[in-house]
């Protein structure tokens, strides 16, 4: 009987990466006050809701302070990954399964970060906002054009659940395993079936409330068809998968 691969899908910011990927970029600013982050964040939260547009404005402000594209790309390469990521990726690859990253960051950032740590080779595909222009400054387009209006969990520029549906409908997998942390990962978890697994970030010792866990546990638990598993580091994810004889 044919042995089907497992599809592993990871969020990037604060899932694979320790911090949100915007922080090392914004820290490049010689004068952070001149980034006008209050105005930029207001536009994101109250006007357009598109993360790529927010970052385009940050890149523009950085360019006005003399930060060039190569400095931005070097910042992408310094993004710290969650402990255990390398070992987990290698084990998934050795077992002939598939790794997909779905992220509201941008494709270039994720590629450069993973390439710098020799992990890009294990990733089958990255679904994220595409970089349209590198010079004189990096400009990121929306992943979805026209903007999506069907999903209220996800931002208009990228719906993670619809991407999961596309993979499920176009390929055959033994199961789908999704790992995330934020509110825009709820949609992805709710698209999973009974045989799949959803991993939500949770740290009982931290004061941080991780939205994926909080929303799924307290508001959408009855709509969740799959088992909800908790993680703090990628080592936790790896250990759980081994205990379940998935890896």
State the predicted function of each range.
Residues 84-98, 105-247:
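C-terminal cap/substrate-recognition subdomain and adjoining C-terminal extension
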């Amino acid at each position: 009987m044919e042995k089907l691969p497992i599809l592993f899908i990871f969020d990037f910011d604060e899932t694979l990466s320790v911090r949100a990927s915007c922080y090392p970029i914004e820290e490049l600013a010689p004068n952070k006050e001149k980034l006008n982050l209050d105005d930029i964040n207001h536009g994101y939260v109250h006007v357009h809701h598109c993360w790529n547009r927010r970052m385009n404005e940050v890149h523009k402000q950085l360019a006005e302070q003399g930060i060039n594209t190569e400095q931005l790309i070097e910042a992408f390469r310094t993004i710290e990954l969650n402990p255990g990521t390398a070992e987990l990726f290698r084990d998934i690859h050795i077992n002939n399964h598939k790794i997909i990253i779905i992220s509201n960051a941008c494709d270039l950032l994720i590629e450069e970060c993973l390439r710098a740590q020799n992990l890009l080779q294990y990733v089958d595909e990255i679904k994220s906002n595409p970089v349209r222009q590198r010079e004189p400054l990096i400009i990121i387009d929306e992943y979805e054009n026209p903007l999506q209006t069907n999903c209220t969990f996800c931002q208009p520029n990228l719906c993670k659940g619809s991407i999961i549906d596309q993979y499920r409908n176009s390929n055959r997998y033994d199961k789908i395993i999704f790992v995330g942390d934020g509110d825009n990962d709820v949609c992805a978890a709710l698209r999973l079936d009974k045989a799949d697994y959803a991993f939500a970030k949770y740290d009982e010792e931290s004061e941080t409330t991780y939205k994926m866990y909080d929303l799924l546990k307290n508001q959408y638990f009855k709509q969740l068809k799959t088992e909800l598993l908790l993680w703090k580091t990628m080592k936790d994810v790896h250990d759980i998968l081994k205990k379940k004889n998935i890896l």
